[in-house]
Amino acid sequence: EERPLAVLLDGEFWAQSMPVWPVLTSLTHRQQLPPAVYVLIDAIDTTHRAHELPCNADFWLAVQQELLPLVKAIAPFSDRADRTVVAGQSFGGLSALYAGLHWPERFGCVLSQSGSYWWPHRGGQQEGVLLEKLKAGEVSAEGLRIVLEAGIREPMIMRANQALYAQLHPIKESIFWRQVDGGHDALCWRGGLMQGLIDLWQPLFHDRS
């Protein structure tokens, strides 16, 4: 089965608080998105979210080894990394890039919105751990396709994202960098989420020949 896969973090928000199904259905019918399998992962609560999302290998191993096989038995999807998007906001954006950097053979497309790349140094006076690992060459973004989005009204987040984008400059042809006129705002995120999926999956329409 070649249907692409999208893993959306904070899934209960996108399923219930700001449902994405109507717009995903519309974009698919209009052939702006390919027919795909969407997996929305519930954060449970703020305590679990703060523990599981920021750079947590155990979380992503559980997703790959336990959750995705169950999903695949119900709704088959492609194993190809270039057909797989992991998307998140805030801690979820950080987590999405972490997944792509550590398991590029599974998660080849990253959609990060307002990613918390300052983590774990909330004051913003020190570089976040993921940026440090990239600078040290401990991880590489080579081969990934990345949507990186941040709002001009979230200064600490914006600074951290700008620093990350500068570090990723050698692969800039594979990055969609967006500064949006907004803050830590779900209304901004929904539009960016849809556009990010369109951009990351656009090559699939050219593969159909």
Predicted features along the sequence, with ranges:
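Non-catalytic cap/lid and distal C-terminal segments of serine-dependent acyl enzymes
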Residues: 1-209
